[in-house]
Regions:
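Short, surface-exposed "cap/lid" segments of acyl-processing enzymes
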Residues: 63-72, 76-117, 132
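Accessory cap/linker subdomain of secreted extracellular hydrolases
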Residues: 208-323
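Short alpha-helix in the alpha/beta-hydrolase fold that links the catalytic acid
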Residues: 73, 186, 312, 328-330, ...
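Residue-level detector of functionally pivotal "anchor" positions at catalytic/ligand-binding pockets or at interdomain
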Residues: 391-418, 442
Length: 443
């Protein structure tokens, strides 16, 4: 069995240590069937092979200065599997309230339950400052996203082994929205530094990989979630400390009181409503015409536009994630109808990587779906992509079927059933025993 190790010369991940854990929930095969039903998941998402148990964990990781800080997360484990299992690390999307973090929603996590039942050991970091973690959440800060994820993988693997389970050395990374950014940050950190983790495949989905260009260009557009901009602003001020001396230098009156709403007790929808209320009542701008730029002091934005060394510009550039070469298979998934995270982020990442990487790299456009609707088809596609690489155990009760498996369905890369099969196109063949083959049909 391959052990997960890390190089002691790389200081960012020195503090990893699980300090407490709690068994939160278990699911029987019948419970998991109910999860499929309640979540409207198609059967081909994954065979229900195992019962599952899930733990909430607290662990030490590093803050932006490299100092130890407590974070929290969740671990889902398939029960009674008979050989070492692959690891799937899920990176969650934008969360403002502590109650929205994975460790606080274990019983409702279809991704964790379904993936573990198929045969993955699933890790989910809350990142810094969310769940029961310490400090302010550094939203879309690549360094601490990556360190929080990597430290949970390292220590989570040791924790899983302490329970008597084994992992097989395969590591799959996927995340959506902010989780796409965190996934890309984790790929970059692992493959650009001397960390002995080997990524089997990754699927960054709908992430803002170009914070300084593709995403920043949306400041002057009507935006479904205006609360994202202050979140980035406050996070980068927390990390770098030089974006402003007084919040009133950046945000117009009334908007400059928003910071208190990012204390972990409010949801993004509540913050959005407050922003739209201020815009309407104070500035006579309705929500259908409001842009993030309407919150920003004119002089601050003018300085940002004219100064190539402006602190906010440099902070955004520091968190761009298209300046490395992926060394493992990667599938970028996004939908061109996304008004929250510009599809141009995925295009820029693909164009930056494609000329140089020698690994499988695919950009999939899910069509004119919005940010929310794109999530399910993207996640299903990522899961099917991983299944073609994963080395699963053969569940005991399926052993008799293995020699007689038969094809039950064919799906495209977004998990949609194929009725008409176009030649020279990638498909997934799902068999009766839950195993998935990746094929190109030629005829």
């Amino acid at each position: 069995m391959k052990k997960f190790l890390f190089n002691l010369l790389f200081p960012l991940f020195l503090s990893a240590q699980i300090t407490s854990f709690e068994l939160v929930a278990t699911w029987s095969i019948y419970d998991i069937q109910d999860v499929y039903t309640f979540s409207s998941l198609p059967d081909y998402v994954g065979e229900i092979n195992y019962e599952v148990e899930a733990y909430k964990v607290s662990y030490l990781t590093s803050d932006a200065n490299g100092d130890p800080i407590m974070a929290s997360g969740a671990i889902f484990i398939p029960l009674d599997f008979t050989c070492p299992a692959p690891i799937l690390s899920w990176q969650h999307g934008t969360v403002v309230s502590d109650s929205g973090a994975p460790s606080e929603n274990i019983e409702n996590s279809a991704i964790g339950i379904v993936s573990a039942s198929h045969g993955y050991i699933v890790f989910m970091s809350d990142y810094l400052g969310l769940g029961s973690g310490e400090g302010f959440h550094n939203y879309c800060h690549a360094q601490t996203e990556a360190s929080a994820v990597i430290d949970l993988i390292i220590e989570g693997n040791i924790f899983v082994e302490s329970l008597g389970f084994e992992t097989n050395g395969q590591l799959f990374l996927m995340g959506y929205s902010q989780g796409g950014h965190a996934t890309m940050a984790t790929v970059k950190a692992i493959e650009s530094n001397d960390i002995n983790l080997e990524i089997t495949a990754s699927a960054p989905m709908a992430g803002p990989y170009s914070m300084s260009e593709a995403q920043a260009s949306m400041l002057n557009t009507v935006y479904p979630n205006p609360g994202y901009f202050p979140y980035v602003l406050f996070a980068y001020q927390n990390v770098y400390g030089n974006l402003y001396d007084n919040i009133g230098d950046v945000l117009k009156p009334e908007f400059d009181n928003l910071f208190e709403m990012y204390d972990g007790t409010y949801s993004m929808s509540e913050i959005n409503e407050e922003i739209w209320s201020i815009a309407d009542n104070i500035y006579d701008i309705d929500s259908e015409n409001f842009t993030p730029l309407d919150m920003i002091v004119d002089d601050y934005y003018a300085d940002y536009q004219s100064d190539e060394s402006h602190p906010f510009r440099l902070a955004l550039q520091e968190n761009d994630l298209i300046d490395f070469i992926p060394e493992s298979p990667m599938r970028l998934l996004h939908c061109n109808g996304d008004a929250d995270v510009s599809y141009e982020n995925a295009v820029m990442a693909y164009n930056a990587f494609a000329p140089f990487t020698t690994e499988e790299l695919v950009l999939l456009d899910g069509g004119n779906l919005n940010h929310s609707d794109c999530a399910l088809v993207s996640i299903i596609s990522a899961k099917l992509f991983f299944d073609t690489y994963a080395n699963f155990c053969n569940p005991t009760f399926l052993n008799e079927l293995n020699s007689n498996q038969y094809l039950v369905n064919i799906f495209d890369v977004f998990g949609r059933p194929v009725i008409k099969q176009e030649p020279n196109t990638l498909f997934f063949k799902v068999h009766s025993n839950g195993f998935v083959d990746k094929v190109i049909l030629n005829y």
